[in-house]
Design a protein with these regions (language model features):
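Surface-exposed, interaction-prone regions used to assemble/regulate multi-protein complexes
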Residues: 1-164
Length: 164
């Protein structure tokens, strides 16, 4: 199967990327804010929802980055820190402010979230190659709790230089 490559320039495009990253697994050390470049990057092990019906469930290593990031805030997670606790990405949402600006929110199971204030939507996703079979499909019972977690205050992360 071919490697997935997607770009998002509007909220609809970002919704497509969110669907492909639903149930992706990553760690805090897989996330970084590159302040000097106004870029937020991540590497995840995404569940391959596009696999043929009847094929064994599998995951793929995927990289993604947001450009034109003005500020990063987080709750329940510190991007770039060493942690063995896996994070499960439930969704990426976008709330417009003054067009074309807005806030993208990465919603994780268990109530963790990262908010990115964006000058505009410029996102790229690319599979990095490896694919492996896994046991079972993701369980979506935590989705409602994770989406409800977007509400409330998020602690402001490092918005200056280096990794947040």
């Amino acid at each position: 199967m071919e490697l997935l490559r997607l770009a998002a320039l509007d909220a609809e495009d970002l919704g497509v990327i969110s669907a492909h990253l639903q149930d992706a697994i990553l760690k805090a050390s897989d996330l970084a804010y590159l302040g000097g470049q106004h870029r937020f990057v991540l590497v995840a092990r995404r569940f391959d929802w596009s696999a043929e019906e009847g094929a064994p469930p599998r995951r793929r290593l995927t990289g993604m980055h947001f450009d034109r990031v003005l500020r990063v805030r987080s709750r329940g997670i510190r991007p770039g820190t060493e942690s063995d606790s896996p994070l499960e990405l439930l969704a990426i949402t976008f709330e417009p402010t003054e067009a074309p600006s807005g806030t993208a929110t990465l919603v994780f199971a268990g109530g963790a979230a990262i908010q990115l204030d964006l000058e505009c939507i410029e996102v790229q996703l690319k599979d990095l190659g490896p694919v492996w079979e896994v046991e079972g499909r993701p369980d979506h019972e935590a989705v409602a709790a994770g989406r409800a977690a977007i509400a409330g205050n998020l602690s402001e992360g490092n918005t200056g230089k280096g990794t947040a």
